[in-house]
């Protein structure tokens, strides 16, 4: 027993393996990234068997199984000691799989090889939980032959997860797999309710390690820290930038990319978002695009992490917003005026509640409902999209209120910008890891780290397993390692990391680069005759790009990431508080346009101008308050790239 425990401990202490993290050798050009992010070939029929075989279990004294791999799932049927008439839990959808690896026994006399899959199925209460399953390849007399069979299955499964084609009649070997992508993770450790770093460490990092992705990680420390970093980033060394926070951090990243002299190349860098903030609108849209049911909190994070592990980019529209002072910024989400922006900014003091702050802010806003006089002008879309009334309403997300964290002790530091620091959680601020860092992240145990499913799912055995040394990146060996925090100074970032050294005079203001707004005349000048103008008293005006205004608010249910449209929604004065509340309740299902509210208006546009005529008010861009006054905006279709998972992956959940 002592030997077994010691072996398991040694397994957890195995050294990091080098993750080069590229989709090919040499610098990463836009062409290389485009090929890597290209949509996969048309999928095979979901029921077409790709592989079939008989395997044992781990430990060896367990039952035996017949495995069948299709393009959508791994089918498992127990053969011995007692065949199953009706297999229970014998279907593992690939939509729930983060990755797989091959393993070998530490016993020299064991000629079997093993492959392990990492899954995140839903439990009885609907929440996801991590589970592993390990299968024993023992049909051949030698370890080399059994290892080849285990690698064949692991390679085929990985190809399906990443949308890579399998050879029709060719041999399936690890050579089919490209080198793993290298991601830069930017984490706001105080995001949302102060859980961002905890969730990143406990859920995100293990999952992307299981997927075999290479990553480096840095925690943001101040306002516009992320913007400064990406402004000087060596883009050729990275295949994607992923923010672990709310919508505000991605706003900084995109504006930093567009503020570079090489913005035309920089804006094509794939970006992703893993929701750990209080405002997770884009993540809600990604979740819906991936086919998952609406979710909040940790469940939404796990859904988006699964999609990130699958890879795959999607064109992303970006809105260029010119403010009254002439400065310009870029939006991927929304421009709001009136009730929505009032709630967003005035609910700041309730940020510790997470997304529930908006519910409370809405109730308080209804109690003091204001109207604003203004003028909205827009250039109608050349081709109008389908009616904004959805064919059917979307299901509501489960409540996040049960995920309230323990209160964190206060920390003595100056307040930071809302997109950088939301709660004073006392956590270290490590710098980005360099290759060969001596302090690796905790290694995942082979058969645990999370709850196991009951029954035939793998458990600890008498002969612990170790990673197959011939595989490029077994799970649990992330390249990212966290340095000790640097006191009172800027983090030391090695030149090999591909990151710029932060400088005090880095530009953090409005963007001076980016595409020209050829549809917009200068602010204050007359608009062309083909524009439509509305003037009057409004309760709110919202210009939104994706479908979601919040993780559980579907403001434009028909919107797509690359439809080239800005979706204008407004509510005129005269609406009652009860009717406005009904609109927002219906927005949780995306059915608010079907209520027939006479004050609710909608238009699809390519550009718009908003001129507030009320002397006081609040304007927000992507949830961030901007200067109050006239503004105008133009949509630039598909100039960005968003990591969303492969098209059509996964199918709508049952």
Swiss-Prot record:
Residues 178-325 form the DAGKc domain. GO terms for biological process: blood vessel development; brain development; cell population proliferation; cellular response to phorbol 13-acetate 12-myristate; female pregnancy; intracellular signal transduction; negative regulation of cell growth; positive regulation of apoptotic process. The modification Phosphothreonine is found at residue 614. Changing residue 138 to A: Abolishes cleavage and secretion in apoptotic cells. No effect on kinase activity. ATP binds at residues 188-190, 220-224, 252, 277-279, 351, 357, 622-624. Residues 447-461 have a biased composition (Gly residues). This is Sphingosine kinase 2. It comes from Homo sapiens (Human). The gene is SPHK2.
């Amino acid at each position: 027993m002592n030997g077994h425990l010691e072996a398991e401990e040694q397994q957890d202490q195995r050294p990091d393996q080098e993750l080069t993290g590229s989709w090919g050798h040499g610098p990463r050009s836009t062409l290389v990234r485009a090929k890597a992010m290209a949509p996969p070939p048309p999928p095979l029929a979901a029921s077409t068997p790709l592989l079939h075989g008989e395997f044992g279990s781990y430990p060896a004294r367990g039952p035996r199984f017949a495995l069948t791999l299709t393009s959508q799932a791994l089918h498992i049927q127990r053969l011995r000691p007692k065949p199953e008439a009706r297999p229970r839990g014998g279907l593992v959808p690939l939509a729930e799989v983060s990755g797989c690896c091959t393993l070998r026994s530490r016993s020299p006399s064991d000629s079997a090889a093993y492959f392990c899959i990492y899954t995140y199925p839903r439990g009885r209460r609907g929440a996801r939980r991590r589970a592993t399953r390990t299968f024993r390849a023992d049909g051949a007399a030698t370890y080399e032959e059994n290892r080849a069979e285990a690698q064949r299955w692991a390679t085929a499964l990985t190809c399906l997860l990443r949308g890579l084609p399998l050879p029709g009649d060719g041999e399936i070997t690890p050579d089919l797999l490209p080198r793993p992508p290298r991601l830069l993770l930017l984490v706001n450790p105080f995001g949302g309710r102060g859980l961002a770093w905890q969730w990143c460490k406990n859920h995100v990092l293990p999952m992307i390690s299981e997927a075999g992705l290479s990553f480096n990680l840095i925690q943001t420390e101040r306002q516009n820290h992320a913007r400064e970093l990406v402004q000087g980033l060596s883009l050729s060394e990275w295949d994607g930038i992923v923010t672990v926070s709310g919508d505000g951090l991605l706003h900084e990243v995109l504006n930093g990319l567009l503020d570079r002299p090489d913005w035309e190349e920089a804006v094509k860098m794939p970006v992703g978002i893993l929701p750990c903030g209080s405002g997770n609108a884009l993540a809600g849209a990604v979740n819906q695009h991936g086919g998952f049911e609406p979710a909040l909190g940790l469940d939404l994070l796990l859904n988006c992490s699964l999609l990130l592990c699958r890879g795959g980019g999607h064109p992303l529209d970006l809105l260029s917003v010119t403010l009254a002072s002439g400065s310009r910024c870029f939006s991927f989400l929304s421009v709001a005026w009136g009730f929505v922006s009032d709630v967003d900014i005035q609910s700041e003091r309730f940020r510790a509640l997470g997304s529930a702050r908006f519910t409370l802010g809405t109730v308080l806003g209804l109690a003091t409902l204001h109207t604003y006089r203004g003028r909205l002008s827009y250039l109608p879309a050349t081709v109008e999209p389908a009616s904004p009334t959805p064919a059917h309403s979307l299901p509501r997300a489960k409540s996040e209120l049960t995920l309230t964290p323990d209160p964190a002790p206060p920390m003595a530091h100056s307040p930071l910008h809302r997109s950088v620091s939301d709660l004073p959680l006392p956590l270290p601020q490590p710098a980005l890891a360099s290759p060969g860092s001596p302090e690796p992240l905790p290694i995942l145990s082979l058969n645990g780290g999370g709850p196991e499913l009951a029954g035939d799912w793998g458990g600890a055995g008498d002969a612990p397993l170790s990673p197959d040394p011939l595989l490029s990146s077994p799970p649990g060996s992330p390249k990212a390692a966290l340095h000790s925090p640097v006191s009172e100074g800027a983090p030391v970032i090695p030149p090999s990391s591909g990151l710029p050294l932060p400088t005090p005079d880095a530009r953090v203001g409005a963007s001076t680069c980016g595409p020209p707004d050829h549809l917009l005349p200068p602010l204050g000048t007359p608009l062309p005759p083909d524009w439509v103008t509305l003037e009057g008293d409004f309760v709110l005006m919202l210009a939104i790009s994706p479908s979601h205004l919040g993780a559980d608010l579907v403001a434009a249910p028909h919107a797509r990431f690359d439809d080239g449209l800005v979706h204008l929604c407004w509510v005129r004065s005269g609406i009652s508080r009860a009717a406005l509340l009904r609109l927002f309740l219906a927005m949780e299902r995306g059915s608010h346009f079907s209520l027939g509210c006479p004050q609710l208006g909608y238009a699809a546009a390519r550009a718009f101008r908003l001129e507030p005529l009320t002397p006081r008010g609040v304007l927000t861009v992507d949830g961030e308050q901007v200067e109050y006054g006239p503004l105008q905006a133009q949509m630039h279709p598909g100039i960005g790239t968003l990591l969303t998972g492969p098209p059509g992956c996964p199918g709508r959940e049952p």
